[in-house]
């Protein structure tokens, strides 16, 4: 059921047909956010499967709200188009690139970097539950980890829906490590058969990476096509816990 808060924000609650919600917002609503008091993992999973980015906010007191976002303009690209700079290639020899080994650490590092403004505790709890149960979900939450030895230098949290991967939040701790992590992520997604890399809100660095901007209707069309296609999970070589980042960038994997 769709209702309105005092400021004209749509209020949504599970069960909700999230594809129909996305269509309604596209046709009738010029802004980007809905709101809900529900952080149920099933609901967050359904929102991700419809192309929303799950965010959260607080009213300054005890009230916590899920604020699903469906951007009016979205930054997207095909992973094969990721720009790999000379600097990224040179620095990549220092690092390994892994997946799903340190989800909790990556999430904590994102909060330490960006604060709790939208990464509210109930949202993080939902993400942790969705990661723990990812094999039983429509969408698969994941962490990407760029490490120098055991040191976690950069990483991100994202979610797979079919052959679409959406980057949700990330961090870096060393100069240049974020550039290497994004380049390695692009190469990993390409090798895994991901057709659409959704980078969310347009920012300058995403354009440098190779992304372009699309309207909300264009995004939903691209997202739904990719969602219905399968992507493979590329695993590290036998006996290894991660990929050499340089090998990913050089397309040796």
Task: Name the predicted role of every residue range.
Residues 1-253:
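N-acyltransferase acceptor-side catalytic subdomain
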